[in-house]
């Protein structure tokens, strides 16, 4: 009995040593494999006071354009106005549609707007874009009397906004309010803001984000599911 127990212990030790040996060989093979696959480079960093041109952040200048019938060389005008703006990665574009508050955008207006977007797409910045009807804090004098005119403008602009989506950082506001800031507007009720948001979502690429002024406005717009099929898209793209 004693010899049998001793033999059993000896066999256990032998099996354990064999297992450890096999694991050791396997581990060595794995180490060699990963050493072969992974390459590392030693890098030494030093402190610097240089400003980094991180994208989509920081201070920005505002560039406003009032759309009219006359053709404009926006590339030349923008280049002149931006010649001192060399250290930023963002800019704001305000597009005033006041001349067309009574009806649809003309073909000349659309051509001017497209030329303006073509000009900003040639810059080294991404753009916060805001459409508006008022620059004077007197929105009720200049805002369209019928919401269908505003949604009509959004529809007309859809092709341009989708074509130049890559230069748009965000679309700010819903075209309404003093300075386009969504205050002092007759369209502040939930139904109107949802209607405007739904149309602007439809008129823009799915990668374009929209922004409203306050959390209360965001909750008012997204708080119900009255707009069939749009509520999920709305909450994903609206900030």
Predicted regions and their residues:
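Active-site groove signature of glycoside hydrolases
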Residues: 128-138, 157-190
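Catalytic-core regions of glycoside hydrolase
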Residues: 170-181, 185-239
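Hydrophobic faces of well-ordered beta-strands that scaffold small-molecule active sites
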Residues: 57-61, 89-93, 127-131, 169-173, ...
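Membrane-interface motif at the C-terminal end of an N-terminal transmembrane signal
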Residues: 21-38
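Boundary/entry segment of secreted carbohydrate-active catalytic domains
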Residues: 33-90, 94
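N-terminal Sec-pathway targeting helices
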Residues: 1-19, 23-26
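The substrate-binding groove and active-site-proximal loops of carbohydrate-active enzymes
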Residues: 97-108, 137-148, 177-189
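Aromatic-lined substrate-binding rim segments of carbohydrate-active enzymes
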Residues: 75-134, 147-150, 202-208
């Amino acid at each position: 009995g004693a010899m049998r127990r001793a033999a059993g212990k000896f066999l256990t030790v032998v099996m354990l040593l064999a297992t450890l040996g096999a694991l050791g060989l396997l581990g060595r093979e794995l180490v060699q494999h990963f050493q072969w696959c992974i390459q590392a480079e030693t890098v030494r960093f030093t402190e610097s006071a240089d400003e980094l041109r991180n994208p989509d952040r920081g201070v920005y200048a505002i560039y406003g354009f009032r759309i009219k019938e006359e053709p404009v060389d926006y590339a030349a005008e923008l280049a002149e106005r931006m010649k001192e703006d060399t250290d930023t990665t963002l800019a704001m574009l305000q597009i005033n549609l006041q001349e067309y508050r009574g009806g649809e955008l003309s073909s000349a207006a659309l051509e001017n707007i497209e030329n303006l977007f073509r000009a900003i797409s040639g810059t080294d910045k991404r753009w916060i874009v805001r459409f508006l009807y008022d620059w004077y804090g007197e929105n009720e004098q200049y805002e369209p009397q019928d919401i269908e005119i505003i949604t009509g403008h959004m529809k007309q602009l859809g092709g341009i906004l989708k074509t130049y989506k890559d230069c748009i950082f965000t679309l700010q506001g819903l075209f309404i309010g003093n300075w386009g800031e969504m205050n002092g507007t007759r369209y502040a009720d939930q139904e109107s803001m949802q209607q405007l948001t739904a149309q602007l979502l439809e008129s823009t690429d799915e990668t374009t984000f929209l922004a409203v002024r306050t959390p209360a406005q965001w909750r008012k717009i997204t708080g119900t599911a009255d707009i069939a099929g749009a509520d999920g898209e709305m909450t994903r793209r609206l900030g």
